[in-house]
UniProtKB/Swiss-Prot annotation:
EC identifiers of the protein: 6.3.5.7
Enzyme class, UniProt record, top EC level: ligase
Protein's name in the database: Glutamyl-tRNA(Gln) amidotransferase subunit A
Species, as recorded: Bacillus cereus (strain Q1)
Key words, A-Z: ATP-binding, Ligase, Nucleotide-binding, Protein biosynthesis
One GO term (biological process): translation
Amino acid sequence: MSLFDHSVSELHKKLNNKEISVTDLVEESYKRIADVEDNVKAFLTLDEENARAKAKELDAKIGAEDNGLLFGMPIGVKDNIVTNGLRTTCASKMLANFDPIYDATVVQKLKAADTITIGKLNMDEFAMGSSNENSGFYATKNPWNLDYVPGGSSGGSAAAVAAGEVLFSLGSDTGGSIRQPAAYCGVVGLKPTYGRVSRYGLVAFASSLDQIGPITRTVEDNAYLLQAISGLDRMDATSANVEVGNYLAGLTGDVKGLRIAVPKEYLGEGVGEEARESVLAALKVLEGMGATWEEVSLPHSKYALATYYLLSSSEASANLSRFDGVRYGVRSDNVNNLLDLYKNTRSEGFGDEVKRRIMLGTFALSSGYYDAYYKKAQQVRTLIKNDFENVFANYDVIIGPTTPTPAFKVGEKVDDPMTMYANDILTIPVNLAGVPAISVPCGFGANNMPLGLQIIGKHFDEATIYRVAHAFEQATDYHTKKASL
């Protein structure tokens, strides 16, 4: 039995009782990585020397009264979250040798909580992708079946947790990039409310959509991690000055009287039968615990995919303009003038999907097209946000599938961008509205691949999401299933 089969609270108790050491936890992580990483390929960079030194330092503090619940816990960090002195590449050749000189705010907070960073996790390049096949280095595989994708863009973050390489991880979510891989890999992933968690130190893809969030084995562990990384940060102008409640207090298993909305659009066209049936079964479980549910409509969600790709690509076009060979990242040697430097550096440094989105965004922002595309997309975004607010006026949470289907095979959709984009049709509206949502395991589909239940909440009401997710988790055993890697 792996130490990582235990929850954070159980491991914390074992540490305090000196049944295990922090070094034991770190070695457990690196041993598992040595055993499975050649197949899973979840990590891009390991930090073994520093992790072992930190573990030895923390071992001397075991039993101290001020040790928090995350004391000594091994974590993996998505490779678009900067880590001081530890290579951060965004899975792009553009940043292949970039060593940051500061820590992201979330990393600072986790260091203050005495977690130990095991390494940096693979992803789709600059977080653009839904399968991890867009990594500039190599594709991560799904621990449940190595022939299948782990999802993206936080595929490495989800796969590492599912494979037992780390206890938990950090990912980022712009259009579903935490929740979708969490669903595909049978783990728990939460996208917080926009502004709940600081984005300082997150390499920007689409600044109005990006959020950092936790990926874990259980809902309780997820709540611990969000508690640690949430809160106002003066270094991030979009960070919200909203009180962070006690997320653990609501994990009672009680959902009696809870009002659940189920959008008909989330169970309709484009959603597979396996995903639909798993959600209906989950609703029966919650109904049996005293919750009620009704069908509702989010009428503008059908426009979410087009809206998202116009807006996110436009923001990406602006954000990635800084990578030009002058200051950040690689620099092409094949140059005769400044124009060559810009063109050749970006042509050589960026992958195909990143180039595709930069082109789309530049087009949408160009003279003559701004009003026709970008401005109208912003107006539709407002309508989508209003749809959610209208539903939340009468309901506590919205529930549906996280993804239309279970994970697909490696290489199956890589040559068809539109089919690939459609994997995120159920997660994208949440980012456009800025509301929080979690994916929890809710069953299995074809070839024993996991399915996820998406629970969406009101702005800054992560507590209710956790309450529902925890109650469902405790009433089922999906979270106890493990990939037999």
